[in-house]
Amino acid sequence: MARRFLFIGDSLIEFFRWQKRFPDVKVYNFGSAGETAEGLLSRLPNIIDRVKSPDLVMIMTGTNNIAMEDYGFLFTYEKIIALLQKHYEQATIVMTSLLPIELFFLGDAVPRVNRKLEDISRSTNTVYLDLYPLFLGEDSKANGAYYEADGVHLSKEGYEVWARALEASVLPSLG
């Protein structure tokens, strides 16, 4: 039976054709534009009812939270992980870092949040996929080639960087 991947989170998950990129697996894309961590947590029971026994679960959430200057979502993120681990005991759970975004009021918020996400990953024994440095240009700002004009959503090239990182660092361990 083909491996099963569950991708959950915000528009950064939703807007890519993961199934086309990974044709040898069954991909369940439950990304939702505008999603916050709280929104994902509220949708999670329905997702768990619909997707049984995935081999891999990848989460990208929090970008919309920090864009609204909501930094309390990390507690919600821990609840998401706990629920996934309870229902998908055999799955490899991958927490992605947030990506660099150029919103003037954020300052160093994304790197600070990413350090907290990495701590959560370590304490919950999940895989942390640090995409942040891969999306920086030589000027240590978001590499414009990887983004759409809005500076938040990814271009085809940006999604390819993400997919290659997943292939290189996570998929080999699935066997």
Name each model feature, range by range.
Residues 1-53:
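Serine-esterase "nucleophile elbow" of acetyl-processing enzymes
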